[in-house]
Amino acid sequence: MKDLFIDIGSTNIKWKREGVVHQTPFPAPLVDGNGLYEVNAEEIFKIVQGLIEDDERVFFSVQMHGYVLLKDGAPVTNYVSWRDERGVNTTPNFTLSKEYGVDIKPNLPRLSLQTQTVEYDEFCTLGSYLVYRLTGINATHITDAAPSGFYNVFTKEREKTAFKLPIESYTIKAIGRYGNAEIYTPVGDQQAAILGAVGKDFQGYVLNLGTAAQLCEILDGFVYGEFESRPYFDGKTLCTVTRLIGGGVIAEHTDEELYERLVEDYGKALKKLPVSSRLVATGGLVKYRKELLCKVLDRLGVNYSFNENCDALAGLEIVSKGEIK
């Protein structure tokens, strides 16, 4: 079966077909400053649309926490990125329990919407927007839906809103067709990258070192704690400590400047998660700053290994085999 795997990352859009990987830069922002970060949604869609050829199935992983608003089926905003923090000085008119899988923070879409002045009747994640443009159906997997702040992952209920929300799926399935290709529910890029890095049966910590960094642990069922209880695959929880020092900051500093900061940052994160015996560090940063990371992890006293090669595309390939939900 001819499959196309597309990963919409923060820096690049990558795709894989018949074993060959390609990439193109993610579009530059139209708005970047004063806490705002917007990208032309049409430009993103045109890139994705242009990738689909005579494929039979298309699988997506997408950056999370961003959104596009629609009115009468047409976009009325740019893509408001996860980098956008317009909600920073906004008092939320809602509360979120741990069951929503996300905390209230400046880039939370649900909070960001309180600042919007445009008229809209439908909300899309980036993943559901791309699927909507391809199939006419606004739908996505819960790993992409939950970061918006509208979905209770534990009860599998959604908020009642005056506007339409994406149809959330707790399994990965075909949503509709674009030409001859079946379009599958998009999944969160963090979850896809971790699946690709450690496989479906891994138990332990995962230090995901991309543009942003997270420390995660995969546990069965729904788990509460001092972390975001993000949905994962097969009904598992991706216990996630967010907003750690990642590639965006590390690229701008020397090892000497960063060492103590990373020890403190990652050490605090480890204390928030249930105790585990091993850690896998993965992501693009591993290739470039391994010596620094070894020093930090040695200091923290964890049993660790590195995985430089696997990414979200590898996770999507596992998804395509039907081995996980």
Give residue spans per PLM region.
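Glycine-rich phosphate-binding/hydrolytic loop that grips phosphoryl groups
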Residues: 189-197, 242-245, 250, 260, ...
